[in-house]
């Protein structure tokens, strides 16, 4: 278990220390579950009343909240961001052994950097290049001529097809598939003719991809995931999609082929986005959004009907089904009124 003096933690976080700097911090916890040795954080003033019951040895908070502190405190401008950074310092995620498992199958032409770890039953095909400190989990497959940049990690059972490029310091969770064929077919009098998908997938630096997500290779041009992009679990990224730098994609999102999404966008969970169009920079699509047309202006966009009691929803659905008839009747009434005038 990692541990650190509170004074040393404050220095690493560039935080202002209030209280005993010799307190030993052994972990991060929520305000409700924290015990002695834990550090917690408060992001909303409404939780001030809980400080008296909190058992944490220290709390991260803003200057405005400091008068309510009942323990040692680290004062920062952004407690949530500080929480993320101190969680990295005190991370308890198991690290793999720095070795190559005897059962791993590695082609003789593969190039491995320094301190590469490869887990049991992983397969590394010919022409693969793994940078320094790359971690390949148990059961992973890395196809021919693919390249994975320094410091990147694949958890167990990740599949990377051939000719894929993954940048530095990326993290890909278990079950994800990168580089499978895109959904490309031509119709010949009712019969589907497969179009070989000869593009690649290019993933930038510092990209994180959740579990069981699929990113298809391009048909001709590449599918591209920009630097700093984060993609949640069970997303489908179709062929030739381009996602701009630092865009966030929540779970269950489906992106159709040849979609281009700008930088700094946020796509809410379970959204469905049409292909062969563009979304500009700094767009937020709220959960379950259905995006059928290009978005050319930054902002927040929503679609769908939020949850309602069933009886209310049934009435709303009936109104929607009859809206065309109601519109025609309204126009007819308007014409009659205008004629009377």
UniProtKB/Swiss-Prot annotation:
GO MF terms held by the record: N-acyltransferase activity; UDP-3-O-(R-3-hydroxymyristoyl)-glucosamine N-acyltransferase activity
GO process terms (BP): lipid A biosynthetic process
Recorded catalytic activity of this chain's protein: a UDP-3-O-[(3R)-3-hydroxyacyl]-alpha-D-glucosamine + a (3R)-hydroxyacyl-[ACP] = a UDP-2-N,3-O-bis[(3R)-3-hydroxyacyl]-alpha-D-glucosamine + holo-[ACP] + H(+); UDP-3-O-[(3R)-3-hydroxytetradecanoyl]-alpha-D-glucosamine + (3R)-hydroxytetradecanoyl-[ACP] = UDP-2-N,3-O-bis[(3R)-3-hydroxytetradecanoyl]-alpha-D-glucosamine + holo-[ACP] + H(+)
Source species, domain of life: Bacteria
Keyword Lipid biosynthesis among record annotations: yes
Xref: SUPFAM superfamilies: Trimeric LpxA-like enzymes
EC number: 2.3.1.191
Pathway: Glycolipid biosynthesis; lipid IV(A) biosynthesis; lipid IV(A) from (3R)-3-hydroxytetradecanoyl-[acyl-carrier-protein] and UDP-N-acetyl-alpha-D-glucosamine: step 3/6
Keywords: Acyltransferase, Lipid A biosynthesis, Lipid biosynthesis, Lipid metabolism, Repeat, Transferase
A GO cellular component entry from the record: membrane
Active-site residues annotated for this sequence: 239
Similarity annotation: Belongs to the transferase hexapeptide repeat family. LpxD subfamily.
Stated role: Catalyzes the N-acylation of UDP-3-O-(hydroxytetradecanoyl)glucosamine using 3-hydroxytetradecanoyl-ACP as the acyl donor. Is involved in the biosynthesis of lipid A, a phosphorylated glycolipid that anchors the lipopolysaccharide to the outer membrane of the cell.
NCBIfam families to which the protein is assigned, alphabetical: lipid_A_lpxD, PRK00892.1
Protein name: UDP-3-O-(3-hydroxymyristoyl)glucosamine N-acyltransferase
Lineage, broadest ranks: Bacteria, Pseudomonadati, Pseudomonadota, Gammaproteobacteria, Enterobacterales
Gene that encodes it: lpxD
